[in-house]
Amino acid sequence: MKDEKIAKKKLTINDIKNKKGAEPIVMITAYDALFAKIFDDYADVILVGDSLNMSFNMKESTLSADMSTMLYHTKAVCTGAKKSFILADMPFGSYTNEKQAIKNAMKFFKQTNADAVKLEVGMHQVNLVKRLCEEGINVMAHIGLKPQFFKFEGGYKIKGKSELEAKRLVEEALAFEQAGAFGILLEGTLSNVASEITRQVRVPVVGIGSGADVDGQVLVWSDMLGFFEDFKPKFVKRYLDGAALVRKGVQSYASEVKNKIFPSEEFSYKG
């Protein structure tokens, strides 16, 4: 398999916007400097997602992630990644009004090297996104299935199944583009609806569980690399059996310690 390292300088907001209809955007999550440094060679965008609450901290949802958590992990990712465009998630409850949203979004720009923030938003928040953009904050609007709303909606439900819902999603995407959002993250949406949204808006649409006819894809790294053995959504392709590889390595280490094989002379200092 060809090594698809991306030879690049630090990507800017214009680099990402210019990929619309030209080159698929590769986005992947990261939550620490170690993995961010690895992903930096391959990802156009690294998303410091509130998904870390589930995939990194093993919580049942994203809801308890807070600003201090997101700032900590965004700082770590920015330490490891020097070329990718860094997108930070605004956690649940951190943008309930314009004043709060601006204050918290500014923290990502003042305290980390993040390039943009992502918000799970609906039509009632178009003006909020507009105000953030007016303050010089790059915003990606997350529409479709919104994990922060799972309790309100009674679960994680695929979007675009009805004609009315599909129409509303197109209208939302257009409204957030008009408000100044540099891109749309579209989650859990029927592929034909995702295709129509991508066709109508002039900004990049990055999909997750929304089919192939979008401007880019994002996956949670631990899903994509096979670290969750009992959890595999339909839209996730596993490119590695990570859990098995790690388990095999730790098992070998434990066995060698128990049997006094490690450390051998090769790994010991001699006087």
Swiss-Prot record:
Pathway where this protein functions: Cofactor biosynthesis; (R)-pantothenate biosynthesis; (R)-pantoate from 3-methyl-2-oxobutanoate: step 1/2
Keyword Transferase attributed: yes
Pfam families linked: Pantoate_transf (PF02548)
A Gene Ontology molecular function term of the record: 3-methyl-2-oxobutanoate hydroxymethyltransferase activity
Positions annotated as active site in the UniProt record: E187
Keywords assigned by UniProt, alphabetized: Cytoplasm, Magnesium, Metal-binding, Pantothenate biosynthesis, Transferase
Cofactors required: Mg(2+)
Main location per the UniProt record: cytoplasm
Cytoplasm among keywords: yes
InterPro entries the record matches: Pantoate_hydroxy_MeTrfase, Pyrv/PenolPyrv_kinase-like_dom, Pyrv_kinase-like_dom_sf
Subunit structure, as described in the record: Homodecamer; pentamer of dimers.
Function recorded in the entry: Catalyzes the reversible reaction in which hydroxymethyl group from 5,10-methylenetetrahydrofolate is transferred onto alpha-ketoisovalerate to form ketopantoate.
Record-given protein name: 3-methyl-2-oxobutanoate hydroxymethyltransferase
Organism from which the protein derives: Campylobacter concisus (strain 13826)
